[in-house]
Amino acid sequence: RTTEAFSTGNRYKEVDRDRQAGVIRSAEHAFSKDGGLAVLFGNIAE
């Protein structure tokens, strides 16, 4: 447990630099060709 909200000491050993299959991908290797970041609106965005 930590005393500071939303804090953690956990870190990955290496940075994810894989732009083809990693979490952050280049446009050429996107998860979906016609998708993008979702925009929240309404009650869920408040």
Curated annotation (Swiss-Prot):
Gene Ontology MF terms in the entry: 2 iron, 2 sulfur cluster binding; dihydroxy-acid dehydratase activity; metal ion binding
S-S pairs: none
Pathway annotation: Amino-acid biosynthesis; L-isoleucine biosynthesis; L-isoleucine from 2-oxobutanoate: step 3/4; Amino-acid biosynthesis; L-valine biosynthesis; L-valine from pyruvate: step 3/4
Cofactor needs: [2Fe-2S] cluster; Mg(2+)
Major enzyme class: lyase
UniProt keyword terms in alphabetical order: 2Fe-2S, Amino-acid biosynthesis, Branched-chain amino acid biosynthesis, Iron, Iron-sulfur, Lyase, Magnesium, Metal-binding
EC number: 4.2.1.9
Reaction(s) this enzyme catalyzes, per UniProt: (2R)-2,3-dihydroxy-3-methylbutanoate = 3-methyl-2-oxobutanoate + H2O; (2R,3R)-2,3-dihydroxy-3-methylpentanoate = (S)-3-methyl-2-oxopentanoate + H2O
Cofactor note (record): Binds 1 [2Fe-2S] cluster per subunit. This cluster acts as a Lewis acid cofactor.
BP terms from Gene Ontology: isoleucine biosynthetic process; L-valine biosynthetic process
Oligomer and partners: Homodimer.
UniProt similarity note: Belongs to the IlvD/Edd family.
Function field: Functions in the biosynthesis of branched-chain amino acids. Catalyzes the dehydration of (2R,3R)-2,3-dihydroxy-3-methylpentanoate (2,3-dihydroxy-3-methylvalerate) into 2-oxo-3-methylpentanoate (2-oxo-3-methylvalerate) and of (2R)-2,3-dihydroxy-3-methylbutanoate (2,3-dihydroxyisovalerate) into 2-oxo-3-methylbutanoate (2-oxoisovalerate), the penultimate precursor to L-isoleucine and L-valine, respectively. Is specific for the (R) isomer of 2,3-dihydroxy-3-methylbutanoate, with no catalytic activity against the (S) isomer.
Name the UniProt record assigns to this protein: Dihydroxy-acid dehydratase
Organism: Rhodobacter capsulatus
Lineage: Bacteria, Pseudomonadati, Pseudomonadota, Alphaproteobacteria, Rhodobacterales
